[in-house]
Amino acid sequence: SQPFFDDKNRAFWMLQSAGWTFYLMLRMASGVGNGVSLSFIIPVLVSAAAGYSITLVMGAIFRSLISRRPIVTWGGSLIIVMLAVAAYSAIDAWMFNMMNREGAGFNGSLFLGSVTINTLLLGAWSALYYGINFYIIVEKQTDQLAALESQATSAQLAMLRYQLNPHFL
């Protein structure tokens, strides 16, 4: 059996799908526990689908940022997270308004409340994305270092064998 992160693409899709499925189940359980009606399911499904899609876009952008200079990586990532939180919060607030306040205008306090939870959610997603990717980078560098050390040891042993060759003496 190969290590989980050997196929980085497969690992990403498995973690992405499992994470958002868990989020969906958690939100649904929270709604059921709070006694809300079944109409609550629709905004939760839309929210999870929007979050899944937004984090796919974030992942594609982060993939291009991760190899840049640190200031570009972290500055760009911060901007992307802020834009993603704004978009995700607007979708959540709009969906909640559509389902629960038919015909009501945009509610700024609902948007700000959504910003809080979505900042935590997308910030955690980003931290996991970078944490896992930096772990993979360090593992690859460790493997490369071990291979180089092995080559150096082999070269030293070959040199020693050559020096101890009786024909050399």
Language model regions located:
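Hydrophobic alpha-helices of bacterial signal-transduction systems
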Residues: 1-143
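Cytosolic signal-transmission helices at domain junctions
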Residues: 130-162
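Conserved phosphoacceptor histidine of two-component systems
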Residues: 161-169
